[in-house]
UniProtKB/Swiss-Prot annotation:
CC annotations in GO: cytoplasm
Source organism (scientific name): Salmonella typhimurium (strain LT2 / SGSC1412 / ATCC 700720)
EC number: 2.3.1.118, 2.3.1.5
Catalytic center residues: 69, 107, 122
InterPro entries: Arylamine_N-AcTrfase, Papain-like_cys_pep_sf
Gene that this polypeptide is encoded by: nhoA
SUPFAM superfamilies: Cysteine proteinases
Regulation of catalytic or functional activity: Inhibited by N-ethylmaleimide and iodoacetamide.
Catalytic activity: an arylamine + acetyl-CoA = an N-acetylarylamine + CoA; an N-hydroxyarylamine + acetyl-CoA = an N-acetoxyarylamine + CoA
Main location: cytoplasm
The keyword Ion transport is assigned to this record: no
Protein name, entry field: Arylamine N-acetyltransferase / N-hydroxyarylamine O-acetyltransferase
Length: 281
């Protein structure tokens, strides 16, 4: 086993899986979601987000930070490939907020070929991300540990949807075109630097739980969900409490020389928002 895979399985608290099967893919997908949180703090600090293998390994594994789709799915792709999976990245367009025009390709997801079938894997869409791979098949509802999803197809375009109560909500659309590392670098740069990017205006975090629950944070507003229902909502009273919550609930490492952050740095980030703890968001 390579040193990278050893560090990866250690980070996931997961026994090494050496055979590329659908069941192994499911196990790794959920373990990754539960161990490595979605978070955008580096965009706000601000720090440049690097996508090369060394940078992702240092930040997500050794510094015990999280990241967003370009980082999380980049790391997941490398781990799957090193295990022996046939995997490559795709790029999607986020349509969750019903944009008036088609947005650019700013969401990284994965296409995995295993056991003579194609599967979509995605550990990087925040609170609504998949926690299990989906078979690349249209109009079939597929259950995951954290909700029901389906894929729809319009020509060469696929649309990922999740069930919200009695309705289906579109998340993003994509095709199966081959993407290059430069495409990810461009999408990553746009996501981090476009003035209207959602990542530049909110502190966002999510960590999924093995029992079907999840923890989310939007600025000072912390929510614990179980089976799709909010069971705890807290307005974090101040930055010191928030600093502790990021470590205790989301497992963020704060002490790494390069990727850690101080309470004062977090305070500077939160002061830039037009939001107050008592307001909730």
């Amino acid at each position: 086993m390579t040193s990278f895979l050893h560090a990866y399985f250690t980070r996931l608290h997961c026994q090494p899986l050496g055979v590329p099967t659908v069941e192994a893919l499911r196990t790794l997908h959920l373990a990754h979601n539960c161990a490595i949180p979605f978070e955008n703090l580096d965009v706000l600090l601000p720090r440049e987000i690097q996508l090369d293998e060394t940078a992702l390994e240092e930040k997500l594994l050794y510094a015990r930070r999280g990241g967003y789709c370009f980082e999380l799915n980049g790391l997941f792709e490398r781990a799957l490939r090193d295990i022996g999976f046939n995997v490559r990245s795709l790029l999607g367009r986020v349509i969750l907020s019903h944009p008036a025009s088609l947005p650019p390709r700013t969401h990284r997801l994965l296409l995995v070929d295993v056991e003579d079938e194609q599967w979509i894997a995605d550990v990087g869409f925040g609170g609504q991300t998949l926690t299990a791979p989906l078979r690349l098949q249209a109009e079939i509802a597929q259950q995951t540990p954290h909700g029901e999803y389906r894929l729809m197809q319009e020509g060469s375009t696929w649309i990922l949807q999740f069930r919200h109560h009695e309705h289906w909500q579109s998340m993003y659309c994509f095709d199966l075109g081959v993407q290059q590392q430069s495409d990810h670098v461009m999408g990553n740069f746009w996501s981090a630097h476009w003035p209207q990017s959602h990542f530049r205006h909110h502190l966002l975090m999510c960590r999924h739980l093995p029992d079907g629950g999840k923890l989310t944070l939007t600025n000072f507003h912390f929510t614990r969900y179980h089976q799709g229902h909010a069971v705890e909502q807290v307005n974090v009273p101040d930055v010191p409490s928030l600093y502790q919550l990021l470590q205790q609930q989301f497992g963020l490492g704060v002490n790494d020389v390069k990727h850690g952050f101080t309470e004062a740095e977090l305070a500077a980030v939160m002061a830039a928002f037009d939001t107050h703890p008592e307001a909730g968001k």
